């Protein structure tokens, strides 16, 4: 599993180098692309190049909406899926509702519920969600299970102030087993 964050593609040079490198990854490598809040700063050519190779594109609702507007402005009617392979998946983070997974272009959207917890701070929650999802994939889980892990990690991340510390594997597994989120600082 290789993760490329759009925040690393905000300069023309970095966008070109990173998107072309990622596009050249061998097929046995799972490429996860995260859209990031810097979506408008990424050159369109980089999106076109990297989406054509991506296995999973993950984004927040705001990032998805912003990117959709950029792509449509460039090519009337274009969507994120226009640039992706039909067999690639999308994961959209929808805040307190968890995330939505579409495993391939014509697949139904699967809602993966969040774990309920009082929200102390949302700093770093997107990064935690992406990292937990990638960890699940590395551990050999299917994407739906990896997204459930990501939701558990995200719930732990928002349970305390600050983006640090990030949840441990044991803490995530405890949430998955019990459904209960506890403040990881206690």
Question: What are these regions, as identified by a protein language model?
Answer:
Residues 24, 70-186:
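Conserved phosphate-binding/catalytic region of the ribokinase-like
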Residues 1-78, 97-98:
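Conserved beta-alpha-beta core of the PfkB/ribokinase-like small-molecule kinase fold
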């Amino acid at each position: 599993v290789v993760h490329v964050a759009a925040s690393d593609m905000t300069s023309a040079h970095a966008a070109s180098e990173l998107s072309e490198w990622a596009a050249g990854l061998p097929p046995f490598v799972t490429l996860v692309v995260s859209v990031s809040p810097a979506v408008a700063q990424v050159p369109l050519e980089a999106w076109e190049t990297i989406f054509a190779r991506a296995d999973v594109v993950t984004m927040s609702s705001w990032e998805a909406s912003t990117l959709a507007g950029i792509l449509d402005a460039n090519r009337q009617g274009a969507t994120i899926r226009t640039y992706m392979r039909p067999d690639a998946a999308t994961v959209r983070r929808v805040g307190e509702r968890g995330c939505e997974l579409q495993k391939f272009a014509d697949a139904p959207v699967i809602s993966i519920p969040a774990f309920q917890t009082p929200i102390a701070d949302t700093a770093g929650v997107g990064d935690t969600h992406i990292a937990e999802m990638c960890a699940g994939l590395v551990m050999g889980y299917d994407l739906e299970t990896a997204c459930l892990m990501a939701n558990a990690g995200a719930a732990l991340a928002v349970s305390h102030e600050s983006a640090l510390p990030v949840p441990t594997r044991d803490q995530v597994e405890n949430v998955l087993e019990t459904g209960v989120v506890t403040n990881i600082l206690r």
